[in-house]
Design a protein with these regions (language model features):
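Hydrophobic anchor at the beta1->P-loop junction of P-loop NTPases
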Residues: 9
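Conserved lysine of the Walker
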Residues: 17-18
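Post-Walker A alpha-helix
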Residues: 21-22
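Short glycine-rich substrate-engagement loop in P-loop NTPases that contacts/grips substrate
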Residues: 28-57
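Structural recognition of the conserved hydrophobic beta-strand(s) that form the central parallel beta-sheet
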Residues: 59-60, 85-91, 111, 120
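Conserved catalytic/switch belt of AAA+ P-loop NTPases
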Residues: 70-94
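Short regulatory helix/loop adjacent to the ATP-binding pocket of P-loop NTPases
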Residues: 94-109, 121-126
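Interdomain hinge/linker elements that couple catalytic modules in large macromolecular machines
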Residues: 122-229
Length: 229
């Protein structure tokens, strides 16, 4: 925000994009507010610059619902010539036919992911993966994780979704991750481009990939796994 007029925060759903951006914003436009959604969409099509009025940085949440806001943000950034004007959050499923400018030089892109074990305060952070790959002399002798194997398996299954850490029991935490996968299979896989896809088949494909994580597998093996389910 100190360098660019706008920042786009990209990443999977539920990873905390809107919550994080809200802590930095001084005004917020929520495109999916049910009481104002239709009004916002009409305004976005007729005069999108009106929706950009507000204290800065102004957060535009779920901006992909009105893709023309992208070019409007770029135009306002050009006019104002002041860093830190807008934060955009939302899905990657965007109708790019309504976007005419890449935003280069005006809109910076940041990738956000679910929390690491360090961020969830479950890891000591003593071992750096970056150093392991980049520094051949990196010494990790004597550094031990405080987590048991069972705890690591649970954390990997639970994931780093902020909502799961708020759940009251371990079972509830796993339900958050399970619901995330179910939502992908039943809704997101079709909403990306509007084409209806089979939720059960999608689930079987994901299961086939999950069974073969960290292995080399032929496409035929994956197909056999799916068709035999």
């Amino acid at each position: 925000l100190d360098a660019f007029g706008a920042v786009l925060i990209e990443g999977p759903k539920w990873c905390g994009k809107t919550t994080t951006a809200s802590q930095l914003a001084n005004s917020i436009l929520r495109m999916q507010d049910p009481s104002l959604r239709e009004e916002y969409l009409v305004t976005a099509k007729t005069k999108p610059s009106i929706l950009l009025n507000g204290a800065t940085p102004r957060l535009i949440d779920e901006w992909q619902d009105a893709p023309m806001l992208w070019d409007a943000v770029r135009t306002v950034v050009d006019d104002r010539q002041i860093p830190g004007q807008f934060i955009l959050t939302g899905s990657n499923a965007v109708d790019k036919s309504q976007i005419h400018h890449s935003g280069v030089g005006r809109i910076a892109r940041l990738r956000m992911l679910p929390m690491s074990l360090w961020e969830s305060q479950e890891s000591t952070g003593e071992v750096s993966l970056k150093e392991l790959f980049n520094n051949p002399d990196y010494d990790i002798d004597g550094k031990m994780s405080k987590m048991t194997v069972e705890e690591l398996i649970f954390a990997a299954s639970r994931g780093g979704w902020p909502a799961s850490l708020l759940a009251r029991t371990p079972k509830a935490q796993l339900l958050v991750a399970k619901n995330y996968v179910q939502t992908i299979c039943s809704n997101d896989i079709s909403s990306i481009d509007g084409k209806k896809r089979d939720a059960r088949l999608t689930s079987m494909i994901l299961r086939a990939y999950a069974r073969n994580v960290s292995t080399l597998v032929k496409k035929k093996s994956l197909l056999d796994d799916v068709t035999s389910s």
